[in-house]
Amino acid sequence: MKLCPWYIALILLPVCLQSQKLPTRDEELFQMQIRDKALFHDSSVIPDGAEISGYLFRDNPKRYFFVVEEDNTPLSVIVTPCDAPLEWKLTLQELPEEASGEGSGEPEPLEEQKQQIVNEEGTELFSYKGNDVEYFVSSSSPSGLYQLELISTEKDTHFKVYATTTPESDQPYPELPYDPRVDVTSLGRTTVTLAWKPTPTSSVMKQPIQYCVVINKEHNFKSICAVEAKMNADDAFMMVPKPGIDFNPFDFAHFGFQSDNNAGKDRNFMPKASSSKLLRQITTKPKVDIQKVCIGNKNIFTVSDLKPDTQYYFDVFAVNAATNMSTAYVGTFARTKEEAKQKTVELKDGKVTDVFIKRKGTKFLRFSPVSSHQKVTFSVHSCLDAIQIQVRRDGKLLLSHSVEGVRQFQLRGKPKAKYLIRLKGSKKGASMLKILATSKFNKQPFPSLPEDTRIKAFDKLRTCSSVTVAWLGTQERNKFCVYKKEVDDDYTEEHKKREQNQCLGPDTRKKTEKVLCKYFHSQNIHKAVTTETIKGLQPGKSYMLDVYVMGHGGHSVKYQSKIVKTRKFC
């Protein structure tokens, strides 16, 4: 048999009277009670002066009760919707007489009390529908049994309720200043500076206050409860159990919820396909694009790492650190500034151009070939880390590649064509490169390179005064120059990386570091290997060896540096 809510209220009535001291409250007893979570967990009783959290299933109303014993009692009720709009109403029902009509002093039977309340509808004091934090405040409320009924018609949702009969002394929510707006004081491409007036709760009432700033791209929020619900929306741990999947339908029917007749009858029955589908829904749900930052008691904050030309919504919440209850300022929104339009560099046919790109930066180049109907060749020499190159012709993307070292791209020509080159730098640091665009195939300033530009050292051929190394060549006859430099034994890969600018040629080296230069090529690409013994070294010393290959146009490319060490004892 399903219990009537009024019947539940009468059963809970002694608990209400015992757990609440209305209108006067025993503070020591109250503090002990609100610390006892078991007392208020999943209870229909609203404790006086404490905020409770609840959960609503869609279209299933929930009712809460509290008793005011004396007339002319101040009353304040605050309802905070979280992730969905709520409909709620507050009604007043007069308390039944405790004594029977004969004046025997014996209480009326429970069934008669229940019938007396059910027959009387009660008086509706307030109702609201929406997602705002809404208040019911009365300076003089009559005695009686108060019922708060809440329902969510949109979806399952969280909510919070706070009620007190001493609103003048109980001020757990921070008070807003006379101007509760959040102002944008500075706006950049990736930063926004916000400012707001401090809450009087901190300056006047000397209560511990901290501010939390929330940033997102969708809309402003009216409560931290709504923010946290949004942030936890993709968390499988927060998912509400569903009838027929997590529980037997009987479990829900027992508690007054409608069950799905098509749900599995076995508590543990769940088809594997459904299970894997549910798991995919949980694991593939995208992360919510929202950020919450608590900044202490400062009332100025700069939000950084934003995207240019993007609209963001900003909310500020004052949080009472003693009660962990919060109040929302009037949020704002702003669009970050656009990226500064970069100057497009014009490439000259057959001329090498040096390009510098900031970390994560982008550069645009334009090329109008002299002979537009001829094939067009782009030669790129990335000096440091890999860079990204995209080439478009008349708006159409022709190529998109990552370039490390030297790469060459050849495109079919088109009359009166114009090319737009987009270069994107490395995430690790600044990028440097040399680029040549030409419609004249014989204009190739960079030498051809093998796929592997490492230098190999032969450990067994090491002596106290020499090392033997080898490197790959190509079918094209090129000039190779070898340089050596003594380094400390603790010379690390990080040191080597700082000197790995492949665009620096032999002209930047000391004459004393030069070992030799020689020409080399092989018609058989599989045999294009050359070896060299570096002599005149000191025993037990470390050296950095570099090999430069010289191009016909005078531009050189450096192979990957190699650290070698001579034997200490021979």
UniProtKB/Swiss-Prot annotation:
Keyword Signal: yes
Glycosylated position list: N324
Record's GO cellular component terms: extracellular matrix; extracellular region
GO terms, biological process: cellular response to fibroblast growth factor stimulus; extracellular matrix organization; gonadotrophin-releasing hormone neuronal migration to the hypothalamus; negative regulation of neuron apoptotic process; neuron migration; positive regulation of cell-substrate adhesion; positive regulation of neuron projection development
Annotated SUPFAM superfamilies: Fibronectin type III
Domain of life: Eukaryota
SMART domains: FN3
Gene3D superfamilies on file: Immunoglobulins
InterPro entries reported for this sequence: FN3_dom (IPR003961), FN3_sf (IPR036116), Ig-like_fold (IPR013783), NDNF (IPR019326), NDNF_C (IPR045805), NDNF_Fn(III)_1 (IPR055271), NDNF_N (IPR056225)
Segment forming the signal sequence: 1-19
Entry keyword set: Glycoprotein, Neurogenesis, Repeat, Secreted, Signal
Domain Fibronectin type-III: 261-333, 447-566
Compartmental location: Secreted
Molecular-function annotations in GO: glycosaminoglycan binding; heparin binding
Described function: Secretory protein that plays a role in various cellular processes. Acts as a chemorepellent acting on gonadotropin-releasing hormone (GnRH) expressing neurons regulating their migration to the hypothalamus. Also promotes neuron migration, growth and survival as well as neurite outgrowth and is involved in the development of the olfactory system. May also act through the regulation of growth factors activity and downstream signaling. Also regulates extracellular matrix assembly and cell adhesiveness.
UniProt name for this protein: Protein NDNF
